[in-house]
Curated annotation (Swiss-Prot):
Keyword Membrane: yes
Name of the protein in its database record: Putative membrane protein insertion efficiency factor
Organism: Rhizorhabdus wittichii (strain DSM 6014 / CCUG 31198 / JCM 15750 / NBRC 105917 / EY 4224 / RW1)
Cellular localization per UniProt: Cell inner membrane
Chief location: membrane
């Protein structure tokens, strides 16, 4: 149930603000797609943690490029 909520929030981001704002993704796949895949694969707790860590790495001094879900 919590996993579905996390996925719903990530999809809402993809369909809402992400469409209006200029593309600034540093990673492939995007953080929202990464979080959706992580929660689908590992569940709400571990997948949510992986998504949170990924979002925290998304800043000008962080990495970039291809970063798949482990």
């Amino acid at each position: 149930m919590i996993g579905r909520l996390i996925i719903l929030l990530a999809r809402a981001w993809q369909m809402g603000p992400s469409l209006v704002l200029p593309p600034t993704c540093r990673y492939v796949p995007s953080c929202s797609a990464y979080t959706i895949e992580a929660v689908s694969r590992y569940g709400a707790l571990k997948g949510g943690w992986l998504g949170f860590r990924r979002i925290c790495r998304c800043h000008p001094w962080g990495g970039s490029g291809f970063d798949p879900v482990p």
